[in-house]
Amino acid sequence: MVINSSNVAVTADFSRAHGTLIVHACTKAMTAPVEWVLADLTKAPVKLDWYNQTISPSMVRASFEWSAGSGMAAKIASGLKAIPHIRFEVTEMSSGPDFNQRFCFTPGLGIFRADVN
């Protein structure tokens, strides 16, 4: 998997799923661990564009588009949920028989998964 100039992770074999990670809020100190999780999963360096979260001044936000094999959204959600004070959602749209899915996470409520169409 490689990261193109638009900061989109793309697999060399054009796998069957793509999606978006939206980090709604994360402390500035945890931005590097978020990028490390994504780099570990994509096997390529990841540098996100972080923006101040206007609702919570001590937090930042970012988004990341990816393309990979089916199941990548679950891997991203599993990797990120261990990061303190993060709030995110990740979607996966599959071109095969697998379900499209969305994972949402907040520290107080934990992780939520739903099939989407």
Positions of PLM-derived features:
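Long, contiguous binding/interaction regions
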Residues: 2-18, 22-60, 67-117
